Amino acid sequence: MVQLGQKDLLVDCQGNWGNILTGDGAAAPRYIEARLSKFALDVVFNPKTTEWKLSYDGRNKEPITLPVKFPLLLAQGVEGIAVGLSSKILPHNFNELCDASISYLRNEEFKLYPDFQTGGSIDVSKYNDGERGGAVKIRSKINKVDNKTLAITEIPYGRTTTSVIDSILKAVDKGKIKIRKVDDNTAANVEILVHLAPGIDCLIGRGARCQ
């Protein structure tokens, strides 16, 4: 339920539902509230697109099936393991899915690639149109604040600011990089400030990206 709410698509949330950027967990169930969004009521639970039956106590009606008018699986993303085979469907951009759906219905060619709430840049040269064996490479976005400070403003999908900072500190412990400290100012947007050690100059260009 929390994962659905964090997507801001099917569920309207109230309370502390956690933060996918920092990895902070949601509050206990008794402290959070949810309701179906207008999008969910129209696209998933629309009475004109499915058959309904009485609920177990006869007071309400519930859908027999849920045929969705929108490629929801591609928007949400999902992963799992069955019969020893791991499968992952990456999330996609809402607007791009709508455009791709229209092109598909018109029998027109289109390109559709994954998109992520956490931002970052993606290399789709080996994506293989999302079929078996395909792979993508996702990178953070790093900006130069000044000669002594770097700002990480986007992080790879599946990572959190906490895990990114941990990887930076491990690199420091191994002597791979030299920094003075790391500040996590993330709220609605990612902002990790990396302060370089004395004697270390920042040579990265503004808007550059690293893995």
Walk through the language-model features, giving the residues of each.
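C-terminal interaction appendages of subunits in large macromolecular complexes
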Residues: 78-81, 85-211
